[in-house]
Amino acid sequence: MGAIRYDMVKKLLHTRYRVSDLEKTISFYKDVLGLEEVRRQTSGRGSQLVFLKAPDSDVEIEICKFDESGPIVVGPDLTHLAFEVEDLDEFAKKAAAKGYSLSDGPHSTGSGRIAFIDAPEGYEIELIERGAKS
């Protein structure tokens, strides 16, 4: 057996999250986080799929609704998705106007500030403002 070639994997393309309320979740990612809807489709098994991405990113989030898989359980080991934001304070104001508040932070780090917000279905989102003054 030969050595593993690390150049075989080129880049991360998407990650998938299963949800029970597709439209509420899509609304959060689009209206609160500002993601763009790339496409919608139905899988061969009947899953409803919506792909989203940040404006300056090629990586997509695949939101999936598939009732046959049973109830949604977000395990404690699934920690979060992280997004870079321009202005954390402005983001918090806009999110609050849409009914969402930060669940933790903002906190200063060596390279900026971070905060967290809870997405629908119990998924956690980390927000990172790089280069912010501590």
Residue ranges and their predicted role:
Residues 21-22, 86-89:
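Helix N-cap motif at beta-to-alpha junctions
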Residues 2-24, 78-81, 131-134:
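N-terminal beta-strand motif that seeds the catalytic metal site of vicinal oxygen chelate
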Residues 9, 16-58:
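Core segments of cupin and vicinal oxygen chelate
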Residues 2-8, 40, 51, 92-134:
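Vicinal oxygen chelate
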Residues 57-61, 122-125:
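Short, charged/polar, Gly/Pro-enriched secondary-structure boundary elements
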Residues 28, 89-94:
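Short amphipathic alpha-helices within nucleic acid-binding modules
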Residues 56-59, 68-70, 88-90:
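Short, charged/polar surface micro-motifs in flexible loops or helix N-caps
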